[in-house]
């Protein structure tokens, strides 16, 4: 569509990176406001932000390398080895970033005696609105595209990197739409007095994870870009299913116990 905003000599300004920067700014603003509203110290995040981002990037890169191993390991040589560290080639994967950043943040909370579940309630909505904006960036960049479609809103991309020359599902816009809806819904849920009173809640964050991952699982059925598969099932789809079920199980176990205590009283 419109992958490069500006190009001159040895410099190119990619639309994707511009929207990623906007997504980071908006997500940060949302995080600060939600943290203050929930009585959490923003300093904990600000003092560890670059560490969280660093491990997120490492995870995103590792997942991308695994997902596109044939591109990096077609030949074993020093040039291909250096390519493993080319973070600027847009070889970053969402699931790797989420998994690595979440694991690191959980360990960080334990080390600093922070309430992981309360932080989850503000981090998940903030991340989801960032992903919504990032979806617009991938649309202009022509990545994360869909399969051929005859639906009225199907889009024909003029991009040599896309393997289809016919109209395809604008899956990036799907991501933007359902992420925006989930973010809005989570804000309303978080304002519910009963949810606010829950000790060590985590309910908002877990609902956000379950709903986003479930809709991403459905999106994977119409994704047309290349991805590593197991038994012809895309690994990102498997990851989305596991994350959905994991979040639902945690919701059931945590909040069933809370209801049982209330009834026993």
What is each of the regions a protein language model found here?
Residues 1-265:
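A feature for loop-to-transmembrane-helix boundaries and adjacent hydrophobic helices
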């Amino acid at each position: 569509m419109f992958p490069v905003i500006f190009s001159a000599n040895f410099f190119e300004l990619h639309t994707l990176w511009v929207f990623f920067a906007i997504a980071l700014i908006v997500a940060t603003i949302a995080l600060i406001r939600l943290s203050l509203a929930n009585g959490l110290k923003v300093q904990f995040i600000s003092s560890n932000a670059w560490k969280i981002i660093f491990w997120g990037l490492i995870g995103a890169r590792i997942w991308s390398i695994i997902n596109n191993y044939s591109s990096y390991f077609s030949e074993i040589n020093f040039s291909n080895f250096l390519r493993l560290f080319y973070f600027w080639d847009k070889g970053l994967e969402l699931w790797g970033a989420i998994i690595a950043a979440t694991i690191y943040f959980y360990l960080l909370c334990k080390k600093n005696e922070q309430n992981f579940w309360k932080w989850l309630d503000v981090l998940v909505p903030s991340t989801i609105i960032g992903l919504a904006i990032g979806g617009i960036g991938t649309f202009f960049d022509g990545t994360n595209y869909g399969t051929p479609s005859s639906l009225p809103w199907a889009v024909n991309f003029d991009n040599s990197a896309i393997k289809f020359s016919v109209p395809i599902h604008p899956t990036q816009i799907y991501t933007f739409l359902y992420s925006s809806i989930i973010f809005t819904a989570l804000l309303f849920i978080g304002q519910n007095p009963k949810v606010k009173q829950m000790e060590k809640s985590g309910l908002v964050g877990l609902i956000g994870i379950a709903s986003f991952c479930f809709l991403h699982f459905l999106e994977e059925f119409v994704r047309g870009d290349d991805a590593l598969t197991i038994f012809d099932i895309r690994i990102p789809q498997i990851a989305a299913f596991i994350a959905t079920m994991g979040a639902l199980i945690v919701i059931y176990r945590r909040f069933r116990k809370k209801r049982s205590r209330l009834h026993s009283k």
